[in-house]
Amino acid sequence: MKVKPLRYSRDQAEFDRAIGFIDATFALALTLLVTTLDIDDPGAAFSSLGALNDAVGQQAIAFGIAFAVIANYWLQHHRLIASFTAIDYTTIAVNLFLVAAIVLLPFSTQSVGDPGVEDLPLPTVIMAVNVVLASTLHTLVYVVAVRRNLLSPAPGRGEISYTVVNGLASAAVFGASVPIAYLISPVAAQITWISLIPISQFLGRYGARRRRTIDAA
């Protein structure tokens, strides 16, 4: 006899427990980012703004980038979960892989923000790969939810295509920065991350028109 997969509707406690755990993990990852700000000599660092910038300037930039990345993932995840009518074990499992990638971000951020290794490509590559994994897994959560009919209203083909392409844009940009870190420099690779801003704006405008065209067909 075929066993029916476990599925919990929004009004069940198991749904709240699953989402509550995921939200708490996002919050923990954001909180742990503060541990990436490390001052070796507080007396010298707080002697002037210039000294403070020398001590934690690069770490603060890495902190800001990682905070924005994690917060953006949580906002996207929050919007996605708002459309869930139920959740099942498969979707919970994919979400656990997602939060595994999220909780690694404080570590990868610390490696990028460490002044002692700023000229080495590996720290930048580690963070880039971390974001690629997080972006891919977040998109996978959406795809799994669509395939298992967990969303209401059910998205059309245009909306599905737009969401998947938009979700994988971060993975593409950060993935492209990996060879740049080795072939040019870590700084050049990190600068390419900024290109995600105009790319996201373009996808937002073009994708909306494309989505309406496909759904109307």
Residue ranges, per PLM feature:
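Multi-pass alpha-helical transmembrane bundle typical of ion/small-solute transporters
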Residues: 1-217
